[in-house]
C-alpha cells in the first residue's frame, strides 16, 4: 500500500496544530495507520536593522524574529483517506506538502 508523507509548516503554531488534529481525526475515522505529527525543530529567522536612518546619533537597533514551526505526518494513502484530507480547510498561514511513496 502507498504511504503519504504530509509536511506542514507555519508561523502560527496554533493553526498548525489545528490542521494536524483534523488530519489525525480523519486517520482515526477511516482506520488507517498513522505516525505523527512529528514536531521538527523550530527555525528562527532573525533580522537586525538600525533604527536611525541618517547614521547620526547613538547606534540603536531593532531586532525582528520570525519562527517557522514544522510538523511531519506519515499516513497510509488509500483513496478514501486522501479524499478526506484534500477537503480539509487549510488556513492561509499554513503551507502543506503531500508526497506519495510506495
From Swiss-Prot:
It comes from the Archaea. The keyword Ribosomal protein applies. Keywords: Ribonucleoprotein, Ribosomal protein. One of its GO terms (molecular function) is tRNA binding. GO terms for biological process: translation. It holds the Pfam family Ribosomal_S10. GO terms for cellular component: small ribosomal subunit. The keyword Ribonucleoprotein applies. PROSITE patterns: RIBOSOMAL_S10 (PS00361). InterPro entries: Ribosomal_uS10, Ribosomal_uS10_CS, Ribosomal_uS10_dom, Ribosomal_uS10_dom_sf, Ribosomal_uS10_euk/arc. Transmembrane segments: none annotated. SMART domains: Ribosomal_S10. Part of the 30S ribosomal subunit. Involved in the binding of tRNA to the ribosomes. Belongs to the universal ribosomal protein uS10 family. PANTHER family: 30S RIBOSOMAL PROTEIN S10 FAMILY MEMBER. HAMAP family: Ribosomal_uS10. This is Small ribosomal subunit protein uS10.
Amino acid at each position: 500500500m502507498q504511504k503519504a508523507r504530509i509536511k506542514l509548516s507555519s508561523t502560527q503554531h496554533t493553526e498548525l496544530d489545528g490542521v494536524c488534529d483534523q488530519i489525525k481525526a480523519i486517520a482515526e475515522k477511516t482506520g488507517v495507520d498513522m505516525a505523527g505529527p512529528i514536531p521538527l525543530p523550530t527555525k528562527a529567522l532573525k533580522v537586525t536593522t538600525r533604527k536611525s536612518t541618517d547614521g547620526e546619533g547613538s547606534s540603536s537597533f531593532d531586532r525582528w524574529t520570525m519562527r517557522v514551526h514544522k510538523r511531519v505526518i506519515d499516513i497510509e494513502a488509500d483513496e478514501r483517506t486522501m479524499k478526506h484530507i484534500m477537503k480539509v480547510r487549510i488556513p492561509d498561514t499554513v503551507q502543506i506538502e503531500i508526497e506519495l511513496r510506495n
